[in-house]
UniProtKB/Swiss-Prot annotation:
PANTHER family: WD-REPEAT PROTEIN INTERACTING WITH PHOSPHOINOSIDES WIPI -RELATED (PTHR11227). Component of the autophagy machinery that controls the major intracellular degradation process by which cytoplasmic materials are packaged into autophagosomes and delivered to lysosomes for degradation. Binds phosphatidylinositol 3-phosphate (PtdIns3P). Its main location: other. This is WD repeat domain phosphoinositide-interacting protein 4. Keywords: Autophagy, Lipid-binding, Repeat, WD repeat. GO terms for biological process: autophagosome assembly; autophagy of mitochondrion; cellular response to starvation; glycophagy; nucleophagy; pexophagy; positive regulation of autophagosome assembly; protein localization to phagophore assembly site. It comes from Xenopus laevis. GO terms for cellular component: cytosol; phagophore assembly site; phagophore assembly site membrane. Transmembrane segments: none annotated. Belongs to the WD repeat PROPPIN family. SUPFAM superfamilies: WD40 repeat-like (SSF50978). InterPro entries: PROPPIN, WD40/YVTN_repeat-like_dom_sf, WD40_repeat_dom_sf, WD40_rpt. It is found in: Preautophagosomal structure.
Amino acid sequence: MSQQRGVNGLRFNQDQSCFCCAMETGVRIFNIEPLMEKGHLDQEQVGSVGQVEMLHRCNLLALVGGGSNPKFSDISVLIWDDSRDGKDKLVLEFTFTKPVLSVRLRSDKIVIALKNRIYVYSFPDNPTKLFEFDTRDNPKGLCDLCPSLEKQLLIFPGHKCGSLQLVDLCNAKPGSSSAPFTINAHQSELGCLAINQQGTLVASASRKGTLIRLFDTQTREQLVELRRGTDPATLYCINFSHDSSFLCSSSDKGTVHIFALKDTKLNRRSALARVGKVGPMIGQYVDSQWSLASFTVPAESACICAFGKNTSKNVNSVIAVCVDGTFHKYVFTPEGNCNREAFDVYLDICDDDIF
């Protein structure tokens, strides 16, 4: 994610009610509805930060050093407990021999991704290494972790090009080399991954970025193929709505796409779908479902997207947070109408400002 206005990285928390910014000047945390700053760590405390991950809305943060003036190394994950008194609020440290590329948290585990390895530790009390998985080259540290208490599913790239691995951390035995289930999702390298909050669905896109495929975690079968576009694109983010009725994605094309999952008839189809029998290559294109709705953000600014709180049964909202400091909220209807409801510059909001 390209850096602008001092923002090195952006992440939503597990229920998408907050987002956090890893910055050249430290860390800032924002509540989404209403939009307001929830807290911050300044540069004197933590230096410049490359990555930050929240644990729900609690006092624990996972930090990885980065940027131009880091206080901490990029081979370490530091756990910051903001509830502790005094200046020393670093309570845990996980150090490796290679750079940490991503961190995921749930209430009882922490997952840390390196270029060719995924580590899983118990968390936060007396952390113990539970699992270690080898992966093919994973330069973006792709992985996702289900936050559900019922399902402890972890997904990450498999050994085969375009494959993803699915591990049930509940059933696997700590310390064992439990073989993950493999889903052959794409023909080219994976570019983006997401798992829904219930742990029942996985979405993936390749680095080509034209298609998003949806899989059932129980049967590991493909359920639907969603078409973002025809031109290659780098996907920054895929997210499910809270009840998994919808999915959104953002890319370097500057468009946030919204797809229907529960009622896929709401998605648009290619006009060629009405033509009749076509060749196999065109057939694949015709069979794809196009987004129900979409909106644009500055194309030169990387962004993450997520679903907001439902305002009514027939109106849903999507939030886009960009590294240029802008915040966008759009509402959409099942008919595909999409309108901007809010815009702000979150980096200009202070502690006492409320949106």
